[in-house]
Regions:
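Active-site-adjacent loop/helix surface patches within enzyme catalytic domains
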Residues: 1-70
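Acidic helix-start/capping segments at beta-turn-to-alpha-helix junctions
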Residues: 72-82
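Cell-envelope/ECM-targeting effectors and their regulatory/trafficking segments
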Residues: 11, 19-22, 51-66, 80-173
């Protein structure tokens, strides 16, 4: 939590950090990703020094490996119902403002399931997928699926479409 970063596994090696899950229809996330483990129990804000280190590390990794903001996900995104980290207290907005992650927002009221699939969430029961989406994009959301959930998910899905088109190719993990 003091901002120190340690490389436990070289970036070009498989780290076995993510476990079972998928993103954008692709299984075996461990073989397609670089894991950043962040020390925080999840029930308190992440210290500024820790977030500064995350931003610096992400910026370097994204430049080295040509990773788009859509490629920056949490364990809860790729393993809904099984993983909950980095949790609702993680400062995703800081990453958004730094251009390192996608932002939720307002969009058309489209079916939630279609938007979550386009974003990359793996198949799971609707409540589990909604909970995983909310952990990342609407941590204050509660109860049954709402129009705000659908609008936010549609906005993120549209961002994914724009980023994919701008890159001229499908997202490659």
């Amino acid at each position: 939590e003091d901002g120190r970063a340690e490389a436990l596994v070289p970036e070009d090696r498989r780290a076995w950090h993510a476990g079972a899950g998928s993103w954008q229809g692709r299984d075996d996330v461990n073989s397609r990703s670089i894991g950043i483990e962040i020390a925080n129990p999840g029930d308190r804000p992440f210290p500024v020094t820790q977030m500064d280190a995350v931003v610096t590390l992400l910026r370097d990794i994204m430049a080295r490996w040509q990773i788009s903001p859509h490629g920056v996900i949490g364990h809860s995104d790729m393993a809904p119902g099984r993983k909950i980290d980095p949790g609702p207290r993680f400062d995703w907005q800081r990453l958004v403002h730094e251009g390192l992650a996608l932002q939720g927002g307002q969009g058309p009221d489209l079916p939630l399931d279609a938007s979550l699939t386009r974003i990359g969430y793996p198949p799971a029961d609707p409540e589990t997928r909604l909970a995983a989406f909310r952990l990342r994009f609407r941590p204050w959301g509660q109860g049954a699926e709402s129009p705000a959930d659908r609008c936010c998910a549609a906005f993120v899905a549209a961002s994914v479409t724009r980023l994919t088109a701008a890159a001229g190719r499908a997202y490659q993990a």
